[in-house]
Design a protein with these regions (language model features):
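Accessory interaction regions appended to the cores of large information-processing enzymes
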Residues: 1-130
């Protein structure tokens, strides 16, 4: 797995194993948000034709936030979630990915580099390494 940071308190994790691929971006907030922005990104390299369920991904990320609180007694507030709509199922993998992002933040694990997930009008995934 590759772990990156994003500007504005964000993190990205990319998991590729065999023929599966998952990308998750999370932006954190200093305080609880009234709602979480959920962005399903398109990719020109569509691995699967069926789209992942964004609401299930949101649930998995929020469960990981709860898991982190139980294990480390550290509270996180999520303001934005980014994922690729045609990445590999199942959605349950996003709980693990979110947990790894947050665990890395708690343990102050240094990321590979900084990355920007650009969201344009088409929501096409464009990754820029800084």
């Amino acid at each position: 797995m590759d772990f990156y940071t994003q500007p504005n308190n964000g993190y990205v994790i990319v998991r590729e194993t065999g023929n599966t691929r998952n990308m998750l971006g999370i932006c954190l907030s200093e305080k609880p948000e009234s709602s979480v922005v959920l962005i399903g990104l398109d990719s020109s390299d569509e691995l699967y034709k069926k789209e992942l369920n964004g609401k299930k991904i949101l649930q998995q990320v929020l469960m990981a936030v709860s898991d982190i609180y139980e294990e480390f007694d550290k509270q996180f507030f999520v303001k934005k979630i980014q994922y690729v709509k045609t990445d590999s199922p199942p959605e349950s993998i996003y709980r693990y990915l979110a947990f790894e992002i947050l665990r890395s933040a708690v343990l102050n694990i240094k990321p590979k580099s900084e990355i920007v997930l650009q969201e344009d009008d088409s929501d096409l995934l464009v990754i820029s390494l800084l």
